[in-house]
Amino acid sequence: MRLAHEEKKGRYIALITIFVCLFLVFGIRLINIQVVNGDKYATKVASSYSTSVVKAARGQILDRNGVVLVGNRQGNDIIFDASSFPSFSEQEKRNEIILSLINLFEKKGEAWINELPITLDSSGNYQFIEDREKDITKLKSRDMLHLNKYATADDCMSEIIERYSLADFQKQDILKIASVCINMKSNVFNTANPYIFAQDVSDELVSVIKENSTTYRGVDVQISTYREYVDGTIAPHILGVTGAIDAEEYAVLKEKGYAMDDIVGKSGIEKVFEENLKGKNGVKTVKTNSDGTQETSIDGLKNGDNIVLTIDAKLQKVAQDALKRVCDSIGTANAGGGAVVVMDCNTGEVLALASYPTYDLSTYFEDYASLAKNKNVPLYNRATLSTYAPGSTAKVSTAIACLEEGVADASSTKYCGYDYNFLGHHFVCQINHANRTINVRTALQDSCNSYFYYYGGEMLGIDKMNMYREMLGLGQPTGIEISENTGVLDSPSYRASINQTWMPGFSLQSAIGQAGNLFTPLQLCNYTATIANGGTRYEAHLVKSVLSSDNSVSVLEKQPKVVCNTGFSENNVKTVHQGMRLVVTNGSCQNNFGKLDVAVACKTGTSQVEKNINGSKKVYTNGFNISFAPYDNPELSVAVAIEGARSGSSCAPVGCDIYNYYFGNNTSDDSTDIPEDENEEDIYSEGPVDSNLLF
């Protein structure tokens, strides 16, 4: 018993010792806080801190002369703040706030974000909205309503009504509330990720919401940055648009610090240079002191870089206006649109690039529905994406190839009769220039098919012909930053890849720019620049430099990049130049380029294309014009393509306006006449390939 008593007594002593030690430790700590560092901790307790994200300003986009094409302005966004907005368990309260807010917006005539792909038909039944397949699929997905792919609009709405307690509302109101609730889920609404209910709201509406903050619990205002355009019609296909990040983009970009409410580039330069333009968000810390004063600091904020383009804004406007004027003057029901590209022959810089019809960036979202349905596809960049049979513009490449390979020289001639016989089959040349002997210069001047059938199709052959076309960039990527189409350089291997047979007649057709060759206006311009400068092909580019947000630091300086040194003979290049100059002095472009003060060299072309118009097949003619100037010391190359043009020379007035502006001439636009069809060189001979000629 005594031993047990001693053990119990020892435990008590140990326990008391532990308590004494703990008391001493806490006592010393308390003395340290209250006496030694009392002032420090008193100040800290008396102060409060709050942090928030500061969005980086998106970088500007400028032309080569520093003219701002795309800038920024501030606007009001209405957001739901999850820290004070009713929780999911208070869905009825959520619905009340959402519907009240929607009614307020509709009363004031302002838009809110409504993306639900369901509407009511004329009978008041739910139905999916046409052309919203992607959104409908997402709505049914596992992450959203978790319904099978065959679910109807009624099935979707039944699930939504049950999930979000909407049974007591009218159908129209159900759709409105449902749209917001579905969007909140899609955008992962939580305390770290506010939901944007409406964007760019008026100050008047903001005031109403703030005055009724108790009604609109958790509804707040966020100042955001919006893109601003000096002129939204300038270079829209180059600049591109921005928009709210979608789920697919967020899955990729969240690792780079993007939030679900971020704005990202969707097309053009805005998309390609997203990483530079975006910048980095910062953290704003507000310290409120015991006396009510505040101290604010922002850490980590880096505004987006500025992108300087090679484009000259004034030249771009001239090119756009000229293209529109000529396209509109054609006025044929077959005309779909056109494109023009202007390049610096000696650097690959794109000085202007226009596609018609076009659109206005400043009203892009309001106009999108009508733009998307327009049969002439104004949203499509014809300059870099549309491919065309180049017609006689390709004869320049055939000419240089024949001269370089020695199958012809400057004095080689060919008698041109209207009929050209090859292996018992008959090809034709144009009526205008038949029954004469011509050389390579006059063959280019008159666009003689017979000359190129013989020296290009028969003597040179498709393999050598294409070797030179590849060097000149035809059917090859130009390297431009925005989306482009590579086109088609027709060949036996290409035909095999599409399960077709290369026929002997294709070589002759290819020599004059027909067969299956398809090139973009950008490729035609780059090819012309290569011919103009003597044989150096540069990578085409739209970006001149990237600068820091205050323009003080150069992030990137784009240098001319040589893609191919062709090594063409100077004499052969001179011969081809002379032939192109004759088109202006003695050929089909005397009435336009021939009137300018600057000496221009050019080549025209046409190609006939079958088009389905209102259910019936019709044949219409595309027109092309490639040119460079000045003739003796080339600086610019210009390529014009117009769908439904009467002739290649009818495209020349676009180039005239460009050269007039660039070289400071005073020739009136009205002096550059659009020739009639009979002045064109090859409109009769460049139709769709006849199967009888292919053998």
Regions found by a protein language model. Name each.
Residues 553-554, 559-561, 654-695:
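Short, gly/Ser/Thr-rich active-site loops of penicillin-recognizing serine hydrolases
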Residues 295-346:
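A conserved hydrophobic secondary-structure block that centers on an alpha-helix together
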Residues 95-99, 103, 203, 207, ...:
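Solvent-exposed, polar/charged alpha-helical surfaces in well-ordered, non-transmembrane soluble domains
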Residues 191, 301-303, 558-560:
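Short glycine-enriched loop/turn motifs at secondary-structure junctions
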Residues 1-275, 281-294, 299-300, 329, ...:
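Membrane-proximal periplasmic segments of bacterial cell-envelope enzymes
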Residues 70-71, 76, 286-298, 311, ...:
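Beta-lactam-recognizing serine transpeptidase/beta-lactamase-like catalytic domain environment
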Residues 83-86, 642-646:
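A generic structural motif
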Residues 321, 325-329, 356-359, 582, ...:
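Conserved helix-loop functional segments at active or binding sites
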